[in-house]
């Protein structure tokens, strides 16, 4: 596959546009630095003066330099001990914004009949709110343990497992396809970090958004300038 720039900042490989959006039935999004502008764990750490320490681990994990993602997340969450729910709400209200084109792309996909899945190594405190605002159909993410309004530095196990890592993102994509009665090739997967690669490999169309180099190299589409809605340039009107 030879990457081709079909427009400034829009690189494709492995297919020839235009595609038909209605040929796809599901679109799966990562959240942090994909649908939204922040890495939530880094911003939460800022509330206890540990952003630099946590962000360094996050950056290494997203580049694929950390082999045990679950352990890296446990380490980061442990450093969040003492953050209050009030501070978490402030981060959501004051720092979190949708990336350019996010709402437009989700709306276009829903209008074309696609279901929308949000799979995140982040936290339900944010994914639940993002899903509600954008009308997202399915979510999977991690639950921070809270006691008396304060983070304990631990996560809560869920019926599906302990932590939503790359393998869990892939599993949730495949489970959602099975639920909808579709093939994974009828799914689009959008992400920016190494933990998005397992689900991107399963999808019929993989999309890297302002992504790490390892992700850009493997994706069918790499959006390197502009917003998420640039993906729509590849589809017939």
Swiss-Prot record:
Q: Name the residues that bind Mg(2+).
A: 30, 32, 192
Molecular-function annotations in GO: L-phosphoserine phosphatase activity; magnesium ion binding
Associated pathway: Amino-acid biosynthesis; L-serine biosynthesis; L-serine from 3-phospho-D-glycerate: step 3/3
The highest taxon in the source lineage is Bacteria
Active site, renumbered: 30, 32
* Residues the record lists as binding substrate: 39, 76, 120-121, 169, 195
Question: Which cofactors must be present for this protein to function?
Answer: Mg(2+)
Q: What's one Pfam family the UniProt record gives for this protein?
A: Hydrolase
* Keywords on record: Amino-acid biosynthesis, Hydrolase, Magnesium, Metal-binding, Serine biosynthesis
Q: Which GO terms describe its cellular component?
A: cytoplasm
Report the Gene3D superfamilies cross-referenced here: HAD superfamily/HAD-like
What is catalyzed by this enzyme? Answer: O-phospho-L-serine + H2O = L-serine + phosphate; O-phospho-D-serine + H2O = D-serine + phosphate
A Gene Ontology BP annotation from the UniProt entry: L-serine biosynthetic process
**Which Enzyme Commission number(s) are on file for it?**
3.1.3.3
According to its UniProt entry, the function of this protein is described as: Catalyzes the dephosphorylation of phosphoserine (P-Ser) in vitro. Also catalyzes the dephosphorylation of phosphothreonine (P-Thr) in vitro.
Q: Family per UniProt?
A: Belongs to the HAD-like hydrolase superfamily. SerB family.
Q: What is this protein called?
A: Phosphoserine phosphatase
- Record gene name: serB
């Amino acid at each position: 596959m030879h990457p081709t720039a079909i427009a400034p900042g829009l690189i494709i490989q492995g297919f020839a546009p235009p595609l038909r959006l209605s040929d796809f039935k599901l679109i799966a999004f990562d959240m942090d630095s994909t649908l939204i502008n922040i890495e939530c764990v880094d911003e939460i750490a800022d509330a206890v003066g540990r952003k630099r320490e946590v962000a360094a681990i996050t950056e290494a994990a997203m580049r694929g330099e950390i082999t045990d993602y679950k352990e890296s997340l446990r380490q980061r969450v442990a450093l969040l001990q003492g953050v209050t729910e009030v501070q978490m709400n402030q981060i959501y209200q004051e720092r979190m914004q949708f990336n350019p084109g996010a709402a437009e792309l989700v709306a276009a996909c829903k209008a074309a009949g696609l279901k929308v899945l949000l799979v995140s190594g982040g936290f339900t405190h944010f994914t639940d709110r993002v899903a509600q605002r954008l009308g997202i159909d399915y979510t999977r993410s991690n639950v921070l343990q809270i006691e008396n309004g304060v983070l304990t530095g631990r996560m809560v196990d869920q019926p599906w497992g302990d932590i939503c890592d790359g393998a869990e993102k892939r599993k949730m994509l495949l489970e959602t396809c099975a639920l909808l009665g579709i093939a994974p090739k009828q799914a689009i997967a959008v992400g920016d970090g190494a933990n998005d690669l397992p689900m991107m490999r399963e999808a019929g169309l993989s999309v890297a958004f302002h992504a790490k180099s390892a992700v850009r190299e493997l994706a069918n589409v790499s959006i390197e300038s502009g917003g998420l809605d640039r993906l729509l340039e590849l589809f017939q009107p």
